[in-house]
Amino acid sequence: MKLFLLVLLSFSLLVSCKKESTSSEKNTQEKKFDMYEMSEMAALMEQMYVDNQRLKERITKGDTIGKFPNHFIKIHNAVMTDESENDVFFKQQAAKFIKAQELIYQDPKNAKEHFNTGVDACIQCHQQKCSGPIPRIKKLYID
């Protein structure tokens, strides 16, 4: 009787172990890795961030400002991750941002003030729409 129980217990352990490995193999095969694709707006905002880092450095050093980056205008019609976010509020904040950016190049004597106004517009919009990048955006401020 003891031998029978020992054989039965051993058999159950082997069967249960085998089932687990089979199910983990299925899970590995079923998992699909989906690559995140940035929306046109997300990519534009990443580019604007980099451009503004460089601009901040030029303003801080007192270098020449250069020309307004015309690709910033795409903010008005770039495809967003969630199209419902492209509402009146977003359009107003985008206009404030563009106006501040244009003023940097039109009035370089007050570039720091105009630059920080542009950063303000970004933060105000992101407080309503997508708060994730706010800490990063705040690093753009010129003291």
Identify the role of each PLM range.
Residues E20-V119, I134-D143:
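Extracytoplasmic c-type cytochrome modules immediately beyond a signal peptide or single-pass transmembrane anchor
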Residues L5-S12:
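Bacterial N-terminal signal peptides
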Residues G118-C130:
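The canonical Cys-X-X-Cys-His
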Residues L14-S16:
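C-terminal motif of bacterial Sec signal peptides marking the signal peptidase cleavage site
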Residues M1-K2:
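N-terminal hydrophobic targeting signals that begin at the initiator methionine
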